[in-house]
């Protein structure tokens, strides 16, 4: 065990001790002893077939339920914080740099050895286009208030690492830790009300303000340094290899709370926040840039000012203040922007560049390369809008709107037309100069909302918006329909309209749809930049299981690369991944390197969801590590793409996918008891009551198909069966081995990044799954006639584990990663009581009608939050 491991254990021990002291102060020694007894029972039950823990929890008095749940939840959050800090802890001089810090310099060395010239490397790095799209899927259980306290705790862990602290200073740090832990303990974990879409957007802005704002300039300094050392060339000022976008306040698919008015409000709040953040930077710069000497270009702008740099910054500061004031007043009025309001990012960047060039020309390069360069990098990356807001809506809503319009105009019903009729109508109207809608048209509420959203898109500055994403897209007409609605709303500039292919059938059909679309007269001429296509991971996995879904996603991308090349159109693939394996999640670096060759051509767009935003970008140091991984992976996938899979591998994958989907659907779709078992054995029904996201957990109607991917995954994760991530693989791999394909599978795992990544992700999720915990839920919650189904599913889980061990040749899952195994083991001591307590609470809750704010229901919600924190990638 390294010294680093020892320090992590010490941190966890100290935080646990301080939490214990806090609990003792509020609840007394006897209660703290009860917590310790529960923890020891959990450990004992892990070592043998004990029932100690369940009986201890069943005997808990009603008033103890909530504080017990809170104690274990708080400990897991503190352990998370310690683990996160561990990743960015300062190393001693004799310790190696973490992989994330070395990944780019090492890659640049390999690329040079592979024959890439210095110029080519610098050019490619400068034009990388990586977009991380922050989304507010309701898996971020922790409240923002608590997240800020946990971040402050990380700050104190860093403070106590300083070797030169006096004993008094060390005591001060411990007191601050004690106070922060007490503050967290006395703060409610669970929101009493659902967040609004605007609340979610503010949470996204907070991630930028507290973390990414600091991480980006530091990350780009290191990229610049690595490039300079490898090639002798600098990263250009205008380069922004990684930018951010958001769905918070723009994603209205299935969320009636995201209206046109909400989208307008979020766009204005982003402008207010950006102006405010840049004002802080400019104030600091104005204090520093007191120099007198300036070049002619700067003098031309400010005349004979004794402090020319401050004069330039004052002009910019005045305009930023005007922008902030206007954005604030526009939230409550329709006040138009005055001439002083900044609208174009160049208006922000140009004065900063002017100062930068002048300082260099006047021999003050060392000053130019300081905070001024950081501010410039932020201006290029975040701009006046922080990031671009995407709009997303279901294709059916556009079809319904057009049907109402054509019906009103006496043209027939758009919904009843075939694809060719729709395309002919849409193309004719897109060319037509007259408006489609008469001024006196009064649409139904749903159509009015679609049209109002399009008007907001048309009115917003181009740089404030990203893509208009069409979920459940299935035809070329779905894209043209949105283009026509945007034209009707007055949009005159190009906007990326992006079909999202998400079910298995839609993924298989993505190629033909795009072939048809790109072949339409005039369509390609209207494209400005690449054709963007979104690949859905969540719904395809829920529809067909991860075996078939992963292969369908891979094949769809291959087809799209080929078709776009045939039409001489550049392609941007947008990956709609979740935090979990069942929703396309997993380590980003490995995932990017496992994409089909040619699919990452210097461009990569992906969603970052829910709690994964906090784990990957919550602290500046961790954000920097993840930005490094993204940048290096996209550069490597662009310049050293993997070879295409061998024909024999494709045949194996075809068979694995066919066997996987059949095995998955035989359980999920064809077993008549399955839905009832799911509802009884997991907290799925109760999750709908959780005030998590602004979006309902279900679509408008239906059974398992109507359930959104998130509660579907979340429910199985809470019980540790993890079913969506592995179901189907056990049969597919067992059948392949029975066909004598073991050596071929081993070859695929060794030589094909796509297959290796799939198996690695499968192994990770199986290591977190726990049949014993899942069985405990069944025993407490499931009616006797449904229990054989649970036993069958646990047998399939065991089969999955055995076949993966056979494939990897390891004695236990994750044997190659003892540190990860140790983390899982450490967490289980605190997770086990939460799981058993949750099963007990569900049983009590279902036997009576409890009010949402009763201690019983609150305790239940806390167990959900605690398990989510303990398992991290929850949904």
Curated annotation (Swiss-Prot):
Its cofactor is Mg(2+). Disulfide bonds: none annotated. Keywords: Carbon dioxide fixation, Lyase, Magnesium. GO terms for biological process: carbon fixation; oxaloacetate metabolic process; tricarboxylic acid cycle. Its EC number is 4.1.1.31. It catalyses: oxaloacetate + phosphate = phosphoenolpyruvate + hydrogencarbonate. It comes from the Bacteria. One of its GO terms (cellular component) is cytosol. InterPro entries: PEP_COase (IPR021135), PEP_COase_bac/pln-type (IPR022805), PEP_COase_Lys_AS (IPR018129), PEPCASE_His_AS (IPR033129), Pyrv/PenolPyrv_kinase-like_dom (IPR015813). The active site is at 137, 542. GO terms for molecular function: magnesium ion binding; phosphoenolpyruvate carboxylase activity. Belongs to the PEPCase type 1 family. Forms oxaloacetate, a four-carbon dicarboxylic acid source for the tricarboxylic acid cycle. This is Phosphoenolpyruvate carboxylase. It comes from Pseudomonas putida (strain ATCC 700007 / DSM 6899 / JCM 31910 / BCRC 17059 / LMG 24140 / F1).
